[in-house]
Amino acid sequence: MEEISNFIKTIMEKDLEEGRVKQIVTRFPPEPNAYLHIGHARAIINDFELAKAFGGYTNLRFDDTNPVNEGAEYVDAIINDIRWLGYEPKNIFFGSDYFEEQYNRAVLLIKKGLAYVDDLSADEITAYRGTLTEPGKESPCRNRSIEENLKLFQEMRDGKYGNGEKTLRAKIDMGHPNINMRDPVIYRILHVPHHRQGTKWCIYPMYDFAHPLQDAIEGVTHSMCSLEFDNHRILYDWFVEKCEMPHVPHQYEFGRLNLTNTVMSKRYLRQLVDQGYVTGYDDPRMPTLVALKRKGFTPGAIRSFILYTGLSRINSVTNAEELDNYLREEQKLIATRPMAVLNPLKVVIDNYPEGQVEYLEASNNMENPELGTRKIAFGKYLYIEKEDFIEEKPNRKWKRLSLDDEVRLMHAYFIKCNSVTKDNDGNIVELHCTYDVETKSGSGFEGRKPNGTIHFVEVTTALKATFNLYEPLVFDETEETKNKSFIERLNPNSWVKLEGFVEASLKDTKPLDRYQFIRNGYYCTDKESTEEHLIFNRTCPLKSSFN
């Protein structure tokens, strides 16, 4: 599908035409402390696709400047997710590899009188910063000598002080209308081992300082980030200029991708996992890429969805079901269409020979003959969906089976229901039907029309299977729930597990195999599925519930 809009693409075209840059270089800079989600996919896909469109390249840089909660587990997961989406970064960098360079640039700022060591606590720094309508106050430490600042900063590096005891701040303007320019902290003390550097460092650069320097070191031309960094751009440019970086990158902000009935906050996702509301980060109800993969979404569907939503400077909300449409569009001609019965009701064909099973020809995808055919079993005992039978036909619109009525079994014969068997509670547990041998599918029979077509599986050859059906994990905030936590908005019916059957052709199914189960929806074989216990996850229904 066609891309809607992308204002950064227009900027890149102009920069190349006017000679401001010779080659487009972008980067994706995740912090390795969480799993990537669909929101990150917007940044990844646009970083790579835009650079590729102009013959440039993209780097992956791990922004590992905060040692708390960072680790190799997330590094590996992020690399795997990017490759799964279909991209290979030209280089894989780590922000921590630039610690020495960044330290030296901070020393340069001190020598230029543009940075100082401060003794104020974090709370005091906040209080001194002022408000949007009131200027900040200068720290008592702001006018320390260059010599003293150099000495104290070295002592900070040497581990002489405890966590939070001192910071290094840029010396800009405490009266600046942009609060970010009011002497921001650029180094803090953290006696926490780093996942790559170990205990070599106990001072770590802040994001606003590290990020522009990393971009400059790597030769990034267009540094794309989300819209909340819009008022940080002036600081980004200040650090690049005052640190005398030989390459000058530029920052561009775009609106976040927000989806209905979806939370993407790292804190919220971690809470869902840690408190057991989901089975893990790859629970198919989660918005993480590993979860979407497990649920059955493909890289192609996600790429098409992201590119279609485009980039703008406005935060917007997209209906989460839009993603389903791209999966349907991609899979409708390439997914095979076996039969699965999720909520089985037993059918006995009274006039079919006991102990006999015949095999009928069935198309793998009636819209794509190139996918060929398969054999399906038909016999005396069958399963159909409970929802496909009602004792008394309610109206002429009912196009399924009812008592004394006739339907076609897909790829097989007409059957007529003659009687039902009920349990002690009055529930129907078995149908007794007859079939008409003259009505075999493909025979050209036109003697009468059935009351619709339904699917089935043959009992003796059918394979038991578990079907996981998913709905939104969390509901959007409403007027009634606006004062409630997101936990209170969780959907108690977000996961429904059904026990049913699939046809025998699925005996060799493997994790991530995708199917369109006829009349049921698009499904994917779960990673925990085995030959003895088949498990299928519903990726999306056959049709969208909105349009």
Identify the function of each model-found stretch:
Residues 4-13, 17-79, 193-226:
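N-terminal catalytic cores of NTP/NDP-binding nucleotidyl/phosphoryl-transfer enzymes
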Residues 17-20, 49-57, 81-91, 216, ...:
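Secondary-structure transition/capping motifs at alpha-helix termini
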Residues 29-33, 61-69, 91-100, 123, ...:
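Conserved short loop/turn motifs at secondary-structure junctions
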Residues 64-66, 72, 94, 108-269, ...:
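Active-site cores that bind ATP or allylic diphosphates and position pyrophosphate for catalysis
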Residues 74-100, 105-106, 113-116:
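A glycine-rich helix N-cap at a beta->alpha junction
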Residues 247-326:
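Long, charged, mostly alpha-helical binding arms that flank functional sites
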Residues 305-547:
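Substrate/cofactor-recognition hotspot
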